Every structure is written in structure tokens, then in C-alpha cells.
């Protein structure tokens, strides 16, 4: 599987990409937005998931502890999974 897979349960958001799996408790999520920057947010400590090259969309997930940028070409499906 090349793309990012996002699954939402009652308590957490599970992001899978290649061999990595990241679990984010829903209570920690502050905001989910589209990121308009080229390389993903300007912050250095953001966790970048996916390949930055060859993708057209970036989704920023802000949480209490850490921020995440998802590099994708399937923005609609990922946002639908997050907001489901």
C-alpha cells in the first residue's frame, strides 16, 4: 500500500503509512485543516507522514501534544475518514 490509510474509531484516529502506525486519541485533536504551504507547515517539530514530492494536498492535524502533516493526493477520502 503506497498511500496513507486513516481509520477513526470511537476513541482514536489511526494513521497507517508503509510500516508505521500512529494512534492519536480523539480527545487530543484540536483542529484538522488543509495546509497550504509547499513543504508542510513551517514548524520544525511537526511529524510529516507520506511523501512530500508527488503529492498535491497537505492535511494538518493539530493535537495537544504534537502536530502532524499528511502528504496525500487523496485529500477528500482522508478528510471524510477523519470527520466521519
UniProtKB/Swiss-Prot annotation:
It comes from the Bacteria. It holds the Pfam family bPH_8. Belongs to the UPF0457 family. This is UPF0457 protein BC_3525. It comes from Bacillus cereus (strain ATCC 14579 / DSM 31 / CCUG 7414 / JCM 2152 / NBRC 15305 / NCIMB 9373 / NCTC 2599 / NRRL B-3711).
